[in-house]
Amino acid sequence: MAAENNVLITMIAHTTDGNEKDTTETIYPGKGYEKDGCYYLFYDEVDPEDAKVTKASLRIRPRHIDIRKKGAVNTQMVFIPGQCTETEYQTPYGKFILTVDTKRAEIRKREKEIDVELDYRLSLGGAQAIRNQMKIKVAEL
């Protein structure tokens, strides 16, 4: 993935909040390229209720992952195994502090595919942390 290529990004998220479990799968067409051992991916998230677009980018580094969003939601989440990171999470309803406690981040690269597995706890505004497990699959088209 040296030059910018069309990619398909599939995200499967498993969320556990107490006894409640939820799974969501979203698929985004996007663009991506590799530079200096990092992968940069760009895609649009469209809110199904009001069709507002949030521009999203995913940077996959050898040891951690960054997700940035700009639009209806503004944030930059950083996933570093064994560390807690804090960021502002700006929504139309206000600004919150988001804490990301990353337990695991695994990255596997193949010729035209990247697989990422994240296991992390998310806490919004000091509320009880919710366990999240996310699988991200990036396939070059």
Map each language-model feature to its residues.
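A short acidic/small-residue loop/turn micro-motif
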Residues: I136-V138
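N-terminal intrinsically disordered, cationic/polar leader segments
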Residues: M1-R131, L141
